[in-house]
């Protein structure tokens, strides 16, 4: 396995690491108070740093693959899979924290299912689809929104506001987070429609 593919795998491995620091542990009544207190105080900031490292591997694997001619079908698959898993897992955590609407997350997940379906139809014809530019823009807006939302509690704390997700303040700081997330949802819809319209032939020619 070449280096770009290893970086994609690393991105997948970092997903549970990120979520561990985002969410308090509560499993069938088991709630370690010391750990959960640490997560509530410092967890999101640590999760943000881990997420940024994971995002940097996304930038690095593509550049290395192109520079050293290490582009493979496995690499195209892993890169796309790692991106989807990372974004969806982190957004699920934000839904659990009541910071992101489940309805908006559903739009993102449905888009990914649709694109995956198109990729499967293309694969049956021997075509492996690499990520398109509009898809990369979509991913970039998602990464920016997620990183901001992760740093949002720290920004609120510096500003003297409460950052309890159960009683989240509505102010310029949180509105910026809402706007950034809405932009990424809009780009998700646009890129999904672009993907669908440009690949309708796979549906028309499917058995």
Model region roles, listed by residue range:
Residues 1-207:
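Alpha-helical transmembrane bundles and membrane-interface segments of multipass inner-membrane proteins
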């Amino acid at each position: 396995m070449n280096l770009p593919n290893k970086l994609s795998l690393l991105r997948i491995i970092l997903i549970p690491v990120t979520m561990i620091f985002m969410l308090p542990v509560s499993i069938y009544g088991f709630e370690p108070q010391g750990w959960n207190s640490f997560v509530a105080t410092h967890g999101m900031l640590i999760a943000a740093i881990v997420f940024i490292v994971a995002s940097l591997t996304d930038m690095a694997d593509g550049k290395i693959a192109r520079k050293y001619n290490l582009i493979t079908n496995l690499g195209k698959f892993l890169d796309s899979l790692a991106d989807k898993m990372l974004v969806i897992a982190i957004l699920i955590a934000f839904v659990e924290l009541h910071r992101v609407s489940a309805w908006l997350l559903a739009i993102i997940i449905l888009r990914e299912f649709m694109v995956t379906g198109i990729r499967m139809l293309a694969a049956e014809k021997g075509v492996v689809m690499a990520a398109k530019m509009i898809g990369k823009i979509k991913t970039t807006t998602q990464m920016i929104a997620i990183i901001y939302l992760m740093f949002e509690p720290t920004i609120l704390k510096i500003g003297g506001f409460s950052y309890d997700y159960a009683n989240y303040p509505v102010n310029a700081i949180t509105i910026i987070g809402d706007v950034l997330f809405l932009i990424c949802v809009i780009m998700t819809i646009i890129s999904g429609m672009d993907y669908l319209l440009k690949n309708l032939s796979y549906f028309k020619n499917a058995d």
